[in-house]
Amino acid sequence: MKDNLASSAFDTNFTHQAVDGRTKIVLFGASKAGDYTLRAYLAKGYDILAFSDNNKALHYTKKEGIPILPPDELSRIKFDQIVICSQYWSEIYQQLTGELNVSKDKVIVANSSELKATTFEAPEVMAQARLALRWMLNMFNHSARPYYLDGGTLLGLARSGDLIPWDNDVDLSILQQDADFYSEFLETSLPDLEQYTSCRWTISYLLYEHSGLVWQKGQLRKIVLTNEDFNFSVALIVRYYNAPFYCYSAVSCIFSDHERHFSQNDWLDFYGVKAAVPCHYQSFLDATYGDWRTEVRDWHYTDYKNTDFYKGGKDD
């Protein structure tokens, strides 16, 4: 009886008329990231057949008029590609290519820019991001506590001296022993940041939902400052020590970088303000990105060189 009900629900919901000549796409992930990926793929001219998601509460509902189907119904659709638009891409990839027997050449992961809402390509957002980073650098440089530019922020400064236009957040790292200091420091300094940028900001603390390599459930994963007026964030990632590496977890990955990069720091200039970066930052970038000097707009999480992928506890 259950199978008949599911079949009836599928027949009722899946009424899409394919558009000849267009690549037929299923988007796996019906969260906010799915919204952004939908816009990106519609703009590219793709024919979006359906969403799919593991959240049963969403099954046979619709997003933007597009049906959200259970994963086990995908075999009933003739699609060209499934695009994973979720931070849990590693688990979903294994689910699709293993449990659901989807051909690997039909499964792709949305690149980082497709998963984002606002980017720094908007001049007013770029101006605010630069202003916020300058404030951070000035304040942190006087704190006598270590910090390091990280991720796309470090990559942009090392390559061109500026933020990457298609990025949408500012990334820094701190060490686990300094997490309490920076949490309190930012909490008390938030009014100053709002005055400096003439914007509203909120602060949030993301905790590990599962114990992992060297962190325990409930320990701080990152501090996130969100600009409520221009919809971008500044993230302080907490790195935990697992000799001889400093590590953190995100998007189904464990990122590990050698302790030599954090024993001290180098400096880069950001619009006249000194910015602390990992020691030997060029080799740090080599280990993270490979050929980091060449711009790659369509960057996927699978492209990182300093990660191990895991299946299990889901921490963004």
Identify the role of each PLM range.
Residues 1-78, 83-118:
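Hydrophobic, well-ordered beta-alpha structural blocks that scaffold small-molecule cofactor pockets
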Residues 125-132, 173-215:
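Metal-dependent nucleotidyltransferase catalytic core
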Residues 39-40, 137-170:
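Active-site nucleotide-donor binding segment shared across nucleotidyl transfer reactions
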Residues 18-19, 103, 107-149:
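Helical scaffold of the NTase/Pol beta-like nucleotidyltransferase catalytic core
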Residues 30-34, 56-57, 87-90, 153-156, ...:
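Short, solvent-exposed loop/turn segments at secondary-structure junctions
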